[in-house]
From Swiss-Prot:
Name the record gives this protein: Transcription antitermination protein NusB
Pfam family, one: NusB
Keyword presence, Acyltransferase: no
Polar residues: compositionally biased ranges: 1-13
The species this protein was found in: Marinobacter nauticus (strain ATCC 700491 / DSM 11845 / VT8) (Marinobacter aquaeolei)
Annotated Gene3D superfamilies: NusB-like
InterPro entries hit by this protein: NusB-like_sf (IPR035926), NusB_fam (IPR011605), NusB_RsmB_TIM44 (IPR006027)
An annotated Gene Ontology molecular function: RNA binding
Region named Disordered: 1-24
Length: 158
């Protein structure tokens, strides 16, 4: 088992994970969180299912596991961070967009190795791909505001 934040290369791979591998890890983690929202299947079962049912050869597996497990483990805390920035009750947020902003909140809080602009951009791109027509605007707004709270030194104008 890996620890949260472990980004060591996967067996058979050398060096740092590629951006595309992390992008795919984020997308799969978001889909796993979405599935969990509806099925209440244990997160370990969802992780195992995704590992079997998807081509993981171009996925940063450690990052996928960190995101999936971390967001699940800290969901209540992440929701408390997000709620002040929401324009509606949490239960009314589209499940895809909710999974994306939870994922982004986790990355902003725990993955300091990922620049806040990357976290926001990746969230926007996932919302465009998987969310509703205007979902990317919602995701952008929430993650931008949250980044100013969690990454003050990084977001402060110079």
């Amino acid at each position: 088992m890996s620890e949260a934040g472990d980004t060591s290369p996967q067996p058979g791979k050398t060096g740092q994970p590629k951006a595309g591998d992390r992008r795919r890890a984020r997308a799969l983690a978001m889909q796993g969180l979405y599935q969990r929202h509806f099925s209440k299947t244990p997160i370990s079962d969802i992780e195992a299912e995704f590992m079997v049912d998807n081509d993981m050869s171009k996925v940063d597996i450690m990052y996928f596991r960190d995101l999936l497990r971390g967001v699940h483990r800290e969901q209540a805390e992440l929701d408390k961070l997000l709620e002040p920035f929401l324009d509606r009750p949490l239960k009314e947020v589209d499940p895809v967009e909710l999974a994306i902003v939870r994922l982004g909140a986790y990355e902003l809080k725990h993955r300091i190795d990922v620049p806040y602009k990357v976290v926001i951009n990746e969230g926007i791109e996932m919302a465009k791909r998987f969310g509703g027509t205007e979902g990317h605007k919602f995701v952008n707004s929430i993650l931008d505001k949250l980044s100013r709270r969690l990454r003050l030194a990084e977001t402060r104008p110079r």
